[in-house]
Amino acid sequence: MPQSNLKIDYTVQLWREGRQYVAHAMPLDVMSAGNTPDEARRALDEAVGLFLKTATDMGTLDQVLEDAGYALCEDGWEGPAWVGVERHTLSVVA
């Protein structure tokens, strides 16, 4: 079976945890970390690539992408259109 290249977009959240930077690929829910923001981004790109390759090898790529909110279009898979990313604070009696 011939292989084809998959081009997919995702939004990256980046934050610091102690001395590490964490990168999170939304909406795929894949995360990685590094000592610098650039290192975390590169590690995340590698992790996303491995995640998608594994899903392809298992025959579950379509389901994984649909579950993450992607839609199959004429030009390939299109991710959700973000309308905002917000930070909220909530006080809870515990």
Question: Where are the predicted features?
Answer:
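Short aromatic-glycine-(Arg/Gly/Cys) micro-motifs in beta-strand/loop hairpins
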Residues: I8-P27
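Generic alpha-helical hydrophobic packing signal
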Residues: V22-H24, M31, F51
